[in-house]
Structure formats: C-alpha cells, structure tokens
C-alpha cells in the first residue's frame, strides 16, 4: 500500500466529522484540524486492512474436505451423478465401499497412533536431563569406538608369505668397499641415535636445535615418521637393537585414530610402505596389522565423483581436500598415481580387493583420457575428471607415477602387461618431447609447460636414470641397450650438477640455458635437503653394469654429506650448495634414513642383498617382494620360487 494518498495535500480541506456528543462533558465540543486528521488516518487504515484481509483470504472451497487430507488422498472423491446409473445416488467404490472405508479408517488410526507415539518420544526426550542425554551420547560413542577396536584387532586371514630372500648379508669381499659400507652404517647410527635422543616420537628431527620437527604433510600429530621410515634400513644394516626400539614404539604408541589431516601420498609411501617392508623383512605381525589399520583410514579420500583421491584426508573424520595451490583444486599425478604397489600388497595380505580395485579404477580412468602429445599432465580435477593446466614433468608432481607403472609390472613377476604397455607409451612420449641434449653434450629431462619446453631439470627427476636402467629389460623393439645408455647419460648429467657446486652436493633444480648448464640460477633452487635420487640412480646402474664409476660417484656424495651436512645432533640440509661455507636448514628429513643412507649402503654391498628379481623398491626405497601368483586372484596361492 502506498502512503501519499492518505497524507493531507496543500489546499485540501478535510470536512469536520460529526463524532456525536463528547464522552466527557468538560472536553471541547469541537476538534482541531490536526486531531481530525489523525482520526481520519486511523479510520482509513482500518478500512484498508479490512478490505485487504477479505481479498487475500484463501478460497474456502479448497478446504471443504480437509480432515487430515486423507479422504481425498487415499480415497478419490467422486462427484454425485458421475458414472451413476440412477441420479441422486452416490457410488464411491461400488460393492466394496464398506471394505475400503474400513481400510481407510484403519490407516487413519495407524497414522494417528504413529504420530502420537512420535510426540510421546519427543516429550520423553525433552523430559531427560542434560546428564542423561550426555550419558546416551557417550554410550553411542563407546559402541562406535568398540566397533572400531574390534575391526582393528581382527585377525587377518593367513596368506602364504613370499620367501625372505637376501634380507641380510651382502658383505663385500673388497676390504676398501667394506670400509666404505661400514662408514655409511656409522652415519646411519649417528642419525638414528640423535633422533632417538632428541626427537623420539616426533616425525622428524631438528639436529641443531635438538628437538622434534614436523611439517603439514604429517598433520598435527606425532606419528613417529622417522621411526617407521627407517625401520627397514636398520634391519638390513643389522642394527637389530635399534630396530627393536622402533618396533616397541610402534606397538605402544602408533595410533591412527587422531584428529589430524595428512597427505595421502606421503603417508602411503612412508608409513604403509615402511610398515609393509618391515613386515616382509622381519615377519612381525604388528607391522602388517598397523599397515592395514592405516590404509582403512585413507580410504575415505577416494570418495570423490571420479574416484581420484583427495591429496589430504583427516584420519578421524575422513574429510578430504586438495592442496590450495594445485591448479584449481586438482589432484596431483605423482600422488594419486603412486599408490599401486602398496595397495596391491594390502589386498594380497587381507584378501580384501577394495584396495586393488581403487588403484585399478585410477588406471582405467587414465587410460580413457586424451593425453596431449602422449604426455600425462600433472593435474587432474577429481570432481570433473578433466586435466588441469598442461604441465608435464618427470620431476616433481609427475615422477613416481611413471616409476610405479614400471614397478607394477616388475612386482607382478612381469605379468601385468597393461602396466608395461602404459610405461612404454609414456617413455616414448617423454623421449620425443622432454629429453634433450645441451650444447655441452649433457642429456637432460625438461618440463612441458603450456605448449613449450622449459630447459630445467629437477633433482627429483634424477631418479629417472635408474628407472630407465631398471626398465631396459623387456623394452620394445629390443632397445634394452638404448635405455641402459640413456640411464647412464642421465646419471652423468646429475653427477655434473653435483660436481659444479662448491659443496659437491646437487641443487634442487638446474638450468640448461645458453652457457649455463647443470647449474641453479635462482637462489630458491640452490638448496640441498639430503635428497636420495642421484644416489638411487648410481645404485641401479651399479647393479646392472658394475661400472666402478658409480661407486666412486656415490662415495663422493657420501663424503660431501659427511663434510657439509653432519652436525653434532644429526644431519641437516644446506641452503646454498654454491656457498663454500654451509648454512644449515636444521632439518633431518625422514627420507634421509629411509632412502639416501639405504641406497648408499646397498651401493657398497653385494648383489645378494635384496636381489632385484625378488624385491621391488617403492618410491621411498621400501622393499616389497615380487608377488608370483599361481592364479589371477590376489588372495590366491603364490607360486614362490
């Protein structure tokens, strides 16, 4: 309603109202103009309200048959005379009229009874005290907790365990090589003992500050990442007292029912991989049990529209999300593509194909997708199933996806031909578009970004030299020699990246622009955080060629780590490998014990220690046995040689 029509206009006169005799004799007999206006305003508003209410009232004909809405809904209304033989006779259901009315009445009574029961239950709830409500909630929580505990302590089905071939030994005959191996073992002892003293139970160690350290990939909880990551290294080095200390901590303290958001990828390769390796090496059931408990906590991460898992998951709530920086909320190729080895072993050990089906679904989805230039972009949106920005790398964000294609084939005793085919296709595309030779003759692997090649190689990509050597046997067109040579060229390039620094340690990434070759240009790329990839490649090439240069290069790296990274409280990364005096970052990474020192130890050991025809190393250097299955089911009987 608009108000201007009710307001007095200039020049308009309002006739006096005859209001009858005054209620109170002592009042004036006449009213002022303003008082008359107020009365007129009130009267106008009252009349408007009455007329408005009349027009806005609902049509009463809509409610002639209200009665809970049952008669018109449950028994259709029939107008008089429609279909009737005699006018004036009402037929609702013909001869069954009484039966239907009885059914209607019973249904109406049931609905009323249910309604009254629900009201009574609600009243009863409201009558309860806060203490009673809290007690009921706690009872329900206890039931859920007990169910979880029962699930966690259930006995896993017995399965034949592959033979523990070459889990110890490997003593070199050459005394000089043995001295070098003993030195690596001493470095491991120094790293472990200081973690044991200053960071026990924490994820990692700050060796200069001498206290625990953690990053967001492990969440907010103290999950003992270094303990789990280092167990298999301790075992193969024969440090059994230290191994038992770690086992006791895991039995008594490792708990996954914590409100902590963790990286699915990192927890899989470090924790599940580490626990599975410790189980296969030692035979201790606690490691298998813990691995399965943790794996169940990761499964909610796969609850996405496409089945591509989130990067992060809360271990308690199961809520997942992706990294905010990852191309419009995409999942990362190297993360969701680096689950296959561990999940296949989980299905084998439990008889539960859920894990196997999760990773096979990822593979099938990737096979169907169009790949620009045959390359896999680093980003995939888990909601839409579409690629993010077209950035392809064999280094960070992409690396271990290609590694796991090859290792899925090797771990299956070379029967997973689909994985091998995908690996071969990918390597051919990488050779065509990413691998180049610099003016100085150094072979490097660049990165493809939005249609052009960036002539930069990361330290993480240096693992590829070992991958090419590992995949040489079984390659297409009898190109084994070619890929072994390609691996050697990558190893030489990565060695140059070490040799061209003041500390003889490699930078995080290095360029090949003009006169600049195998050298970091930006300050943010000059750090070394105890990474293993170059030494990993040396070890694989040593195993396949026994060329002494790889042991020599590995020893150079070990001496550089000892000189520039060793501190009284452990080992630390350095911020600038080109500065002659090291500035430490004060972090002893868990992968230094899991990978770097393990690969150095194996480099100076005999080939009978963890032979490659029986063991396949996951991307965190945790050895998992080849599964030689007698039939197509993962939980079937393996034909172990």
Curated annotation (Swiss-Prot):
Reaction equations catalysed: N(4)-(alpha-D-Man-(1->2)-alpha-D-Man-(1->2)-alpha-D-Man-(1->3)-[alpha-D-Man-(1->2)-alpha-D-Man-(1->3)-[alpha-D-Man-(1->2)-alpha-D-Man-(1->6)]-alpha-D-Man-(1->6)]-beta-D-Man-(1->4)-beta-D-GlcNAc-(1->4)-beta-D-GlcNAc)-L-asparaginyl-[protein] (N-glucan mannose isomer 9A1,2,3B1,2,3) + 4 H2O = N(4)-(alpha-D-Man-(1->3)-[alpha-D-Man-(1->3)-[alpha-D-Man-(1->6)]-alpha-D-Man-(1->6)]-beta-D-Man-(1->4)-beta-D-GlcNAc-(1->4)-beta-D-GlcNAc)-L-asparaginyl-[protein] (N-glucan mannose isomer 5A1,2) + 4 beta-D-mannose; N(4)-(alpha-D-Man-(1->2)-alpha-D-Man-(1->2)-alpha-D-Man-(1->3)-[alpha-D-Man-(1->3)-[alpha-D-Man-(1->2)-alpha-D-Man-(1->6)]-alpha-D-Man-(1->6)]-beta-D-Man-(1->4)-beta-D-GlcNAc-(1->4)-beta-D-GlcNAc)-L-asparaginyl-[protein] (N-glucan mannose isomer 8A1,2,3B1,3) + 3 H2O = N(4)-(alpha-D-Man-(1->3)-[alpha-D-Man-(1->3)-[alpha-D-Man-(1->6)]-alpha-D-Man-(1->6)]-beta-D-Man-(1->4)-beta-D-GlcNAc-(1->4)-beta-D-GlcNAc)-L-asparaginyl-[protein] (N-glucan mannose isomer 5A1,2) + 3 beta-D-mannose
Family to which the UniProt record says this protein belongs: Belongs to the glycosyl hydrolase 47 family.
Protein source organism: Mus musculus
Function: Involved in the maturation of Asn-linked oligosaccharides. Progressively trim alpha-1,2-linked mannose residues from Man(9)GlcNAc(2) to produce Man(5)GlcNAc(2).
Location of N-acetylthreonine modifications: 2
Name used for this protein in its record: Mannosyl-oligosaccharide 1,2-alpha-mannosidase IB
Residue intervals passing through the bilayer: 37-57
Any one GO cellular component localisation term in the record: Golgi membrane
Record gene name: Man1a2
Pathways involved: Protein modification; protein glycosylation
Enzyme Commission designation: 3.2.1.113
Record-annotated active site: 508
Keyword set, alphabetical order: Acetylation, Calcium, Disulfide bond, Glycoprotein, Glycosidase, Golgi apparatus, Hydrolase, Membrane, Metal-binding, Signal-anchor, Transmembrane, Transmembrane helix
PANTHER family for this protein: MANNOSYL-OLIGOSACCHARIDE 1,2-ALPHA-MANNOSIDASE IB, MANNOSYL-OLIGOSACCHARIDE ALPHA-1,2-MANNOSIDASE-RELATED
Principal location class: Golgi
Sugar-modified residues: 631
Membrane side Cytoplasmic: residue ranges: 2-36
Keyword set includes NAD: no
């Amino acid at each position: 309603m608009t108000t201007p029509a009710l307001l007095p206009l200039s020049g308009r006169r309002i006739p006096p109202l005859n209001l009858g005799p005054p209620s109170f004799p002592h009042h004036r007999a006449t009213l002022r103009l303003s008082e008359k206006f107020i009365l007129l305003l009130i009267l106008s508003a009252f009349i408007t309200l009455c007329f408005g209410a009349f027009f806005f009232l609902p049509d009463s004909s809509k409610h002639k048959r209200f009665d809970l809405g049952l008669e018109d809904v449950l028994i259709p209304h029939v107008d008089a005379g429609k279909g009737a033989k005699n006018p004036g006779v009402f037929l609702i259901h013909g001869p069954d009229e009484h039966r239907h009315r009885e059914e209607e009445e019973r249904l109406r009574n049931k609905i009323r009874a249910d309604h009254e029961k629900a009201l009574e239950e609600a009243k009863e709830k409201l009558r309860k005290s806060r203490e009673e409500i809290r007690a009921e909630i706690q009872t329900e929580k206890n039931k859920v907790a007990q169910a979880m505990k029962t699930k966690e302590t259930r006995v896993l089905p017995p399965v034949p365990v592959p033979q523990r071939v070459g889990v110890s030994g490997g003593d070199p005959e050459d005394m000089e090589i043995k001295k070098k191996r003993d030195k690596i073992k001493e470095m491991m002892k120094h790293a472990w003992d200081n973690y044991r003293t200053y960071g026990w139970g924490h994820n990692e160690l700050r060796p200069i500050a001498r206290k625990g350290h953690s990053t967001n990939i492990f969440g907010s909880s103290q999950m003992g990442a270094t303990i789990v990551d280092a167990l298999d290294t301790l075992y193969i080095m024969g440090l059994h007292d230290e191994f038992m200390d770690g086992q006791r901590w895991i039995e008594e303290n490792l708990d996954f029912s914590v409100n902590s958001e963790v990286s699915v990828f990192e927890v899989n390769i470090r924790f599940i991989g580490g626990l599975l390796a410790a189980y296969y090496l030692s035979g201790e059931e606690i490691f298998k049990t813990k691995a399965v408990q943790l794996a169940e906590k990761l499964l909610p991460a796969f609850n996405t529209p496409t089945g591509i898992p989130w990067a992060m998951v809360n271990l308690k709530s199961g809520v997942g999300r992706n990294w905010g920086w990852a191309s419009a909320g995409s999942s990362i190729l190297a993360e969701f593509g680096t689950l296959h080895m561990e999940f296949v072993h989980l299905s084998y050990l439990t008889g539960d194909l859920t894990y196997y089906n999760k990773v096979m679904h990822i593979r099938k989805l990737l096979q169907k997708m169009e790949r620009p230039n045959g390359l896999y972009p680093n980003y995939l949106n888990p909601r839409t199933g579409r690629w993010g920005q077209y950035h392809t790398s064999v280094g960070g964000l992409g690396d271990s996806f290609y590694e796991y294609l090859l290792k899925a084939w090797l771990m299956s005793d070379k029967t997973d031909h689909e994985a091998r085919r995908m690996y071969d296709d990918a390597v051919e595309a990488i050779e065509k578009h990413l691998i180049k030779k610099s003016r100085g003759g150094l072979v490097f692997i660049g990165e493809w970004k939005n249609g052009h090649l960036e002539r930069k190689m990361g330290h993480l990509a240096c693992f590829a030299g070992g991958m090419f050597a590992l995949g040489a046997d079984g390659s297409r067109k009898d190109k084994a020699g070619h890929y072994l040579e390609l691996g050697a060229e990558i190893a030489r390039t990565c060695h140059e990246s070490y040799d061209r620094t003041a500390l003889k340690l490699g930078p995080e990434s290095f360029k090949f622009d003009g006169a600049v070759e195998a050298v970091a240009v930006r300050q943010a790329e000059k750090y070394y955080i105890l990474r293993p990839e170059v030494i990993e490649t040396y070890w694989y090439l040593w195993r396949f060629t026994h060329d002494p240069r790889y042991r020599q290069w590995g020893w150079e790296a070990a001496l550089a780590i000892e000189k520039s990274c060793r501190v009284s409280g452990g080992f630390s990364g350095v911020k600038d490998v080109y500065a002659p005096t090291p500035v430490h970052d004060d972090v002893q990474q868990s992968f230094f014990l899991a990978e770097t020192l393990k690969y150095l130890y194996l480099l100076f050991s005999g080939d009978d220690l963890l032979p490659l025809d029986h063991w396949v190393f996951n991307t965190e250097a945790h050895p998992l046995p080849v599964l030689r299955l007698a039939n197509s089911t993962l939980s079937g009987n393996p034909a172990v040689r």
